[in-house]
Amino acid sequence: MPGLKASARTLTAAWSSGPPKFHVKHSSDGDASPWRATLTPHEAQLLEAAYAEAVQRGFLGPREQERLWERHLDDALGLAAIRRPEPEERWADLGSGAGLPGLPLAVAHRATFFTMIDAQRRRLDWVEATAAKLRLTNVEAVHARLEDYGRGPARESFHVATARALGPLPVVAELGLPLLAVGGQLLVPRGQPDTKELEQAALACEQLGGRVDDVVPNPSSPIDRVGFVVIMAKIVATSPRFPRRSGVPARTPLGQQRDQKR
C-alpha cells in the first residue's frame, strides 16, 4: 500500500522536527469552557455528581475531585470539536474504564450511539448504572476483551472509535482499527506524542488497513497540560489475521516488530 507508507513517512518526518506550534483555547481559559455549553445546566450537574462518585469508587484518583471538568469532562466533550458525533453514527469507547470519553459525549450527543467496551465487569456495572441515572438510551456497555470483540459480529461496524488510556499507539491501532468500517476514524488523546511511537504506529497501521492521518492539538486540554489527539483512519478492510489473540498485541506490538527488523 504505497499511499499508506508515504503518508506515514510524511507525518513522522514532520513531527520529528518538533511538535507544531499552536495557539489552543484551553478549557481553563476564562470562567467556563465552551464544551460545557453543549450541556444543559441539569446535565452538567448530573455529570459532575456521577464523576464525583467515580472518584469515591476509586475509578479516578482522589486528586481528580478538584479537576473533574478540566482534566476529564471538558477533555472528553472537546473531542467533538475534532470529530463531531453525527446522528445514527456508532462510536466505540475502547477500554472505557470510567466511561471517558464516551459517557460525557453520549450526554451531549444523544442521537449518536455509543458502545463502551471494557474487560473489567465492575467498571462496566458502574457505567451502566450511571447511564441509567443520566437517562441515556444511546449507550451500550459490553464486557469483553478487545481482541475477542474485534473478531465478532461488531467487526468493521463503527464509524468512530476513541481510546483514552488503552496503551501504546501500535497496540491501540491493532485493537481499534479492526472495529472500524472503511472510512472510519480512531481518535487517541495523548500528551505530547513521541516520534518513535508515532513511527511504530504508522508501521502497525500499514498492516491493519489504515494510516496515521494527523496529530492535532486537543482544544480542551487544560492550560497546564497541553495535549494532542492522534487520528488514525481506516482505508481498506483489515486482514482477518488481526487482532491477534488476547494479550499478544500488548506483548509484541506490530510496529515494534517491523521497526526492529530494519
Describe every region a protein language model picked out.
Residues 123-125, 194, 198:
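Short alpha-helix immediately C-terminal to the canonical SAM-binding loop
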Residues 119, 166, 189-193, 217:
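Short strand-turn motif at the edge of the Rossmann-like AdoMet-binding core
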Residues 165-166, 236:
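Short glycine-/small-residue-rich Rossmann-like dinucleotide-binding loops
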Residues 77-165, 173-176:
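Conserved SAM/SAH cofactor-binding pocket of Class I
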Residues 180-182:
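Helix-to-beta-strand junctions that scaffold the AdoMet/dcAdoMet cofactor pocket
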Residues 199-262:
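SAM/dcSAM-binding transferase cores
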Residues 3-92, 122-139:
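Class I SAM-dependent transferase core
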Residues 147, 191-195, 220:
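Short "lid" loop at the C-terminus of a central beta-strand within the Rossmann-like core
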